[in-house]
Amino acid sequence: MAYVQEEWIPLTGLGRMVAAGEITSIDEVLASGRPIKEPQIVDLLLPDLEDEVLDINMVQRMTDSGRRVKFRTVVVVGNRNGYVGFGQGKDVQVGNAIQKAIVNAKLNLIKVSRGCGSWECGCETAHSIPIEVTGKAGSVKVTLKPAPQGIGLVTGDIPKKVLMLAGIKDVWAFNRGQTRTTINYAKATFEALKQTNMVRIGGTE
């Protein structure tokens, strides 16, 4: 989803380093340990990033002045090659809520370690994940297991969208909890992908 971009004036030290060309890759940004506070950092270093809206919900709240309605959106971003982000946004306008969610997803960007962790495969290419990982959000628990090449993404529609944007092609997924709650289903998948970086082994990318 494209939006009109204004000229970027960096407000953080990390942003100024990226704008000045002192940092030239998203890997350097993530390795620095500094939080990404400006989405333009991601726009500049990952120009091929895609986004997908996973859910739009209307949220109502009673106030002294009456009933207030906002839209809550859930968005995932990724470049289909090892980087993915998850975010949500709220606003009285759907378009603004989506844009806020996209910004938050970029600020929450992570690198996913990919590999061939299936004993049935052993091709040593980055088509799956290197290890079994689990993520939780609310009542939802998602476990991702390495799958051999050609199996595809054996999971529900929501995790499949997250995994595709992360660049994962083959995986087995097992779920528990209220998976009808899109926000928790997507976040649990994202949290599982975070865990791929906890163990560094050979044959990962």
Swiss-Prot record:
Listed InterPro entries: Ribosomal_Su5_D2-typ_SF, Ribosomal_uS5, Ribosomal_uS5_arc, Ribosomal_uS5_C, Ribosomal_uS5_euk/arc, Ribosomal_uS5_N, Ribosomal_uS5_N_CS, Ribsml_uS5_D2-typ_fold_subgr
rRNA-binding is among the record's keywords: yes
GO cellular component assignments: cytosolic small ribosomal subunit
Domain S5 DRBM per the UniProt entry, residue ranges: 49-112
Gene3D superfamilies: 3.30.160.20, 3.30.230.10
Pfam families noted in UniProt: Ribosomal_S5, Ribosomal_S5_C
Keyword Iron-sulfur among UniProt keywords: no
An annotated GO BP: translation
Entry keywords, A to Z: Ribonucleoprotein, Ribosomal protein, RNA-binding, rRNA-binding
GO molecular function, one term: structural constituent of ribosome
Domain of life, source organism: Archaea
Signal peptide: none
Protein's job: With S4 and S12 plays an important role in translational accuracy.
Subunit structure comment from the entry: Part of the 30S ribosomal subunit. Contacts protein S4.
Family named by the database record: Belongs to the universal ribosomal protein uS5 family.
Domain notes: The N-terminal domain interacts with the head of the 30S subunit; the C-terminal domain interacts with the body and contacts protein S4. The interaction surface between S4 and S5 is involved in control of translational fidelity.
NCBIfam families: PRK04044.1, uS5_euk_arch
Protein name, UniProt field: Small ribosomal subunit protein uS5
Organism: Methanoculleus marisnigri (strain ATCC 35101 / DSM 1498 / JR1)
